[in-house]
From Swiss-Prot:
This is D-aminoacyl-tRNA deacylase 1. It is an enzyme of class 3 (hydrolase). Homodimer. Interacts with CDC45 and TOPBP1. Keywords: Cytoplasm, DNA replication, DNA-binding, Hydrolase, Magnesium, Metal-binding, Nucleus, Phosphoprotein, RNA-binding, tRNA-binding.
Length: 209
């Protein structure tokens, strides 16, 4: 799941020439749902969006307050194009969840968002419709979120088990001591003075005209 979060002074959605949704100060969230998204990703994204600190505090300190802290509004718009991959110059959307399934998932996302915050402060567009989204970005401030976050696979129990096994193999290799070839490399070599002097003679002869 991907989200583009923009801090706004106002934002609205128009469908067929009619404004269907609007907010004042707050955040506008463009949400892209992928084929692999589950309830776990949904809940993670809701927490991230609501707790993202993109606002100032009372003293003017930046990046101190979230939309919940400030009791500002949230406008959500479903945006499957965030799951785009390029084939040459042509966008391909095979990673996006199919519309029928995604609509139900998106409604669940909105429900969770409203439950975690204040229902009257969470607005949305119209799923599947051709929309004009008017965003007055404040700053501008635009943050990209992803669930799971890049690199989060390392916290997966299966992945951790693999890493532990790799570490154990390394430790066993160290415990065996140096291999024969490394012993040979580390063994002191006797100096061959004749070879050394011969090599020096070759070099000096190349330098002389």
């Amino acid at each position: 799941m991907k989200a583009v979060v923009q801090r706004v002074t106002r934002a609205s959605v128009t469908v067929g020439g009619e404004q269907i949704s609007a907010i004042g100060r707050g955040i506008c969230v463009l949400l892209g749902i992928s084929l692999e998204d589950t309830q776990k990703e949904l809940e993670h994204m809701v927490r991230k969006i609501l707790n993202l600190r993109v606002f100032e505090d009372e003293s003017g300190k930046h990046w101190s307050k979230s939309v919940m802290d400030k009791q500002y509004e949230v406008l959500c718009v479903s945006q499957f194009t965030l799951q785009c991959v390029l084939k040459g110059n042509k966008p391909d959307f095979h990673l996006a969840m199919p519309a029928e399934q995604a609509e139900s998932f998106y409604k669940g996302f909105l429900e969770q968002l409203r439950k975690a915050y204040r229902p009257e402060l969470v607005k949305d567009g119209k799923f599947g419709a051709y929309m004009q989204v008017h965003i007055q970005n404040d700053g501008p401030v635009t943050i990209e979120l992803e669930s799971p976050a890049p690199g989060a696979a390392a916290s997966d129990p299966k992945q951790l088990s693999k890493l532990e096994k790799q570490q154990q193999r390394k430790e066993k290799t160290r415990a065996k001591g140096p291999s024969e070839s490394s012993k040979e490399r580390s063994a002191p070599r006797k100096e061959d003075r004749s070879a050394s002097s011969g090599a020096e003679g070759d070099v000096s002869s190349e330098r002389e005209p």
